[in-house]
UniProtKB/Swiss-Prot annotation:
Source domain of life: Archaea
Cross-referenced SUPFAM superfamilies: Tryptophan synthase beta subunit-like PLP-dependent enzymes
Top EC class for this record: lyase
Cofactor names: pyridoxal 5'-phosphate
HAMAP family per UniProt: Trp_synth_beta (MF_00133)
Protein name, as recorded: Tryptophan synthase beta chain
One Gene Ontology CC term in the entry: cytoplasm
Length: 424
């Protein structure tokens, strides 16, 4: 079998919340200013905050969100990468959860629909958010169009100019993208005055988006890191679990990339549910990231700000520092300085391990994958591919099954690939 599909009437109708199953209680956020929690309550939709701290293990997905999931391409298929299996020696079964098949081209639409829906239900004038490479921004733009909401997207400055096609996508959906830091907010103007040549960062863009929402009657929505965002995205993992069971397959390894953590967590957490409940971890969980932003392999597990402007409460997570300005690598979605608290806790407990790969290694595998499987991965997604070679080499003489979160396609990133790989 090459492709495993779910029919729309077989799609899961619940998200998964990992909080009740964590091996220990998640460290509580800290507010050192006395203002961060109030800011959070004003900026974020109340229903999103309710999910953020909920103890309900399997909350039901609202019907209107389920309908929109189906409208934008859910359920997504699982594809078996048989040619890549042959290239790696034939001892692996490699299954790809194809989140690139959604209308926005990535996994980001899974939570964007929920965030925008809850903002609309609360009567917000608009939504504002940050985006790195533009996958989240284009997903929010699409979700806002479907729910008839205005959206303002603060896109990391280097990506705003280096990745114009996702910006154009946002315009097509009726959104308002802005380079961050921008002249559009007081905070952005202050940053530009201090650092006129800054490439920007996701931390900066988060602060701008929050300030804009607070100052203009909108609601801020986060594209990763927070528990509620991961919960909304677990529709992917819930589908994948059902698909693998239908096919009679049980993954030994679950692999995916981490920018802030929601992509990998959304696939891995539903599989971890039974293992955490039983206290016995039987699969191997590996998350990969960018060596240029080595938060997982060189970061510290400590309290840090999720945004550069120190607007939000401190979270305990793996971090290389809220004020870290990452280099202008093409995998813009991996440039965030920290890892989601839930995923960080699992990493700290040794349940999830981490790898970081530099752009050259990741893009080498992006090209190999494109030539063997005929599908071009997003630059971010390509950072998961070197893990497959490691797994194949480690298990010579043994058959292993690997499930990969194929988080997005690279069709809008061909200009970046052309520069990095020196195409004519």
């Amino acid at each position: 079998m090459i492709r495993i599909d779910l029919k729309q009437d077989e799609m899961p109708d619940h998200w998964y919340n990992i909080l009740p199953d964590l091996p220990e209680e998640l460290p509580t956020p800290r507010d050192e200013t006395g203002e961060a929690f109030d800011t959070l309550k004003k900026a974020v939709p109340a229903k999103v905050l309710e999910y953020e701290f909920s103890g309900e293990r399997y909350p039901k997905i609202p019907d209107e969100i389920l309908e929109r999931y189906m409208q934008v391409g859910r359920p997504t298929p699982i594809i078996r990468a048989k040619k890549l299996e042959e290239l790696l020696g034939g001892n692996l079964k490699i299954f790809l959860k194809m989140e690139s098949y959604t209308y926005s081209g990535s996994h980001k639409i899974n939570s964007a629909l929920a965030h925008v829906f809850f903002a609309r239900e609360e009567g917000a004038k608009f939504v504002s958010t940050e985006t790195g490479a533009g996958q989240w921004g284009s997903a929010v733009a699409l979700a806002s169009a479907l729910f008839h909401m205005e959206s303002h997207i603060f896109m990391v400055r280097t990506s705003f100019y280096a990745k114009p096609y996702r910006k154009y996508m946002m315009y097509m959906y009726g959104a308002h993208p802005h380079p961050s830091p921008s002249e559009f907010t007081e905070y952005g103007r202050e940053v530009l005055k201090r650092m006129p040549d800054t490439p920007g960062s996701l931390g900066l863009a988060i602060s701008e988006a929050i300030h804009y929402a607070l100052d203009n009657g909108g609601k801020y929505i986060a594209g990763s890191v927070i528990n509620s965002d991961i919960l909304f995205k677990t529709i992917a993992g819930m589908e994948a679990k059902k698909q693998m069971e239908m096919a009679g397959e049980d993954p030994d390894y679950i692999v995916g990339v981490v920018g802030g953590g929601s992509n990998y967590a959304a696939l891995a957490f539903p599989f971890l549910a039974d293992e955490l409940s039983s206290g016995k971890i039987r699969r191997t969980y590996i998350a990969s990231g960018s060596k240029e932003v080595p938060k997982m392999t060189e970061g510290e597990y400590r309290y840090d700000y999720p945004d550069t402007g120190k607007v939000l409460p401190l979270l305990k997570m793996y971090t290389i520092g809220y004020d870290f300005i990452p280099p202008a690598v093409y995998a813009g979605g991996l440039r965030y300085h920290a890892v989601a608290p839930t995923l960080s806790l699992l990493m700290n407990k040794g349940i999830v391990s981490a790898r970081d790969y530099d752009q050259e290694e990741a893009f080498k595998w992006a090209r190999i994958f494109s030539e063997t499987e005929g599908y071009i991965p997003a630059p971010e997604t390509s950072h998961a591919l070197p893990i497959l070679k490691e797994i194949a080499d480690k298990n010579r003489g043994e058959k292993k099954t690997v499930l990969v979160s194929f988080s997005g396609h690279g069709l809008l990133d061909l200009g970046n690939y052309a520069e990095a790989l020196h195409f004519e």
